């Protein structure tokens, strides 16, 4: 029997062998504070590739040193960082998967000794530092940093780029009226609040012609914040600019209580897919092969992003295949251990 979860998916000239994506998750393991890849990253991402993930997306990688969440984040702000990232893509490719990178700037959530930057001088909460409102010059410099990061991503061998526009980081801060109180062309109307992301996408398109994803927080979980319906217009604009897929997460732009349950964010992937007519990825408490297969069969999303479940078990695709009764092609090195893998957690 054929299963959609294990069917190929082609975006532009990149074909994924299945619909399983390793969701980007910060590892805080660049131990020297220099943004460099370490042996941990090679093992961490290479193992998921060997585990038969279709697309391995590495963690939020800072386009500027001041755009890190912590000083242990990976970086792509300098050419000296390309070599380590290229080793990572080589590990991933050699083990049968495609490689993606998430380009990010932490904005007001940067927990560094340097000043945090944001569209407006509003802290995330009472315990975090007051950010500095970005000047137009700083905005232009950041747009350029995303473009340069895209150039380096190509040099490092990545197949896919994702722009991190979610979880209360810099781009999300510009998009949301809760965090963007600017009175210039970067604030006010939805069109103005989208301008920063528009300029980033345009700048990346000048140097990158591969698949381009954007991760969004499709719900601010606040009465005065953005909802998934607001993101329909945003994602229509993204599609017009050539974005290929929307990775649909939610929350974290402001402190909020979120009702979390299995597949709680799938509704956002479905809504964006239906109303913006663009491919989507579903993410959030997707933990079984049957659940993932159902999402795809219901046409609620095109790709399945797996996060914590891949931390618990790097071989999740094999477990999902066993669960569904699908015979997954094994790496030849593991052919002496056919059959079921324990699903005990």
Swiss-Prot record:
Its Enzyme Commission number? 1.6.99.1
The secretion signal range is none
Which keywords fit this entry according to its UniProt record?
A: Detoxification, Flavoprotein, FMN, NADP, Oxidoreductase
Q: Which cofactor does it need?
A: FMN
Q: Would I find Cell inner membrane among this entry's keywords?
A: no
Q: Which residues bind FMN?
A: 23-26, 60, 102, 215, 307-308
UniProt-annotated binding residues for substrate: 28, 164-167
The keyword NADP appears for this protein:
yes
GO molecular function list? FMN binding; NADP binding; NADPH dehydrogenase activity
Please report which protein family the annotation says this sequence is part of. Answer: Belongs to the NADH:flavin oxidoreductase/NADH oxidase family. NamA subfamily.
Protein name, entry field: NADPH dehydrogenase
Q: Cite the source lineage.
A: Bacteria, Bacillati, Bacillota, Bacilli, Bacillales
Q: Which gene encodes it?
A: namA
């Amino acid at each position: 029997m054929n299963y959609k979860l294990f069917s190929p998916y082609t975006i532009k000239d990149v074909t994924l062998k299945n619909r399983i994506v390793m969701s980007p998750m910060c590892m805080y393991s660049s131990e020297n504070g220099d943004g460099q890849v370490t042996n941990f990253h090679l093992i961490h991402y290479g193992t998921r590739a060997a585990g038969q993930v279709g697309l391995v997306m590495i963690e939020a990688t800072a386009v500027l040193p001041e755009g890190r969440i912590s000083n242990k984040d990976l970086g792509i702000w300098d050419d000296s960082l390309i070599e380590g990232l290229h080793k990572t893509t080589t590990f991933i490719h050699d083990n049968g998967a495609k490689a993606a990178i998430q380009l990010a700037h932490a904005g007001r959530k940067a927990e560094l000794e340097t000043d945090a930057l944001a569209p407006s001088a509003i802290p995330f909460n009472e315990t975090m530092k007051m950010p500095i409102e970005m000047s137009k010059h700083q905005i232009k410099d950041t747009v350029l940093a995303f473009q340069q990061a895209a150039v380096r991503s190509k040099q490092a061998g990545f197949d896919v780029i994702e722009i991190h526009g979610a979880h209360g980081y810099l781009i999300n801060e510009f998009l949301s009226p809760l965090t963007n109180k600017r009175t210039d062309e970067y604030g006010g109307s939805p069109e103005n609040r989208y301008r920063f992301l528009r300029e980033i996408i345009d700048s990346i398109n000048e140097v990158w012609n591969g698949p381009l994803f954007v991760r969004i927080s499709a719900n601010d979980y606040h009465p005065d914040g953005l909802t998934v319906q607001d993101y329909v217009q945003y994602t229509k604009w993204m599609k017009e600019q050539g974005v290929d897929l929307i990775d649909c997460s939610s929350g974290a732009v402001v402190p909020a209580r979120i009702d979390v349950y299995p597949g709680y964010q799938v509704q956002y992937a479905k809504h964006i897919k239906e109303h913006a007519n663009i491919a989507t990825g579903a993410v959030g408490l997707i933990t079984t092969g049957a659940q993932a297969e159902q999402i795809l069969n219901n046409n609620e999303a095109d790709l399945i992003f797996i996060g914590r479940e891949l931390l618990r078990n790097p071989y999740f695709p094999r477990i999902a295949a066993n669960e569904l009764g699908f015979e997954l092609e094994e790496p030849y090195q593991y052919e002496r251990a056919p059959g079921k893998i324990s699903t005990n957690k």
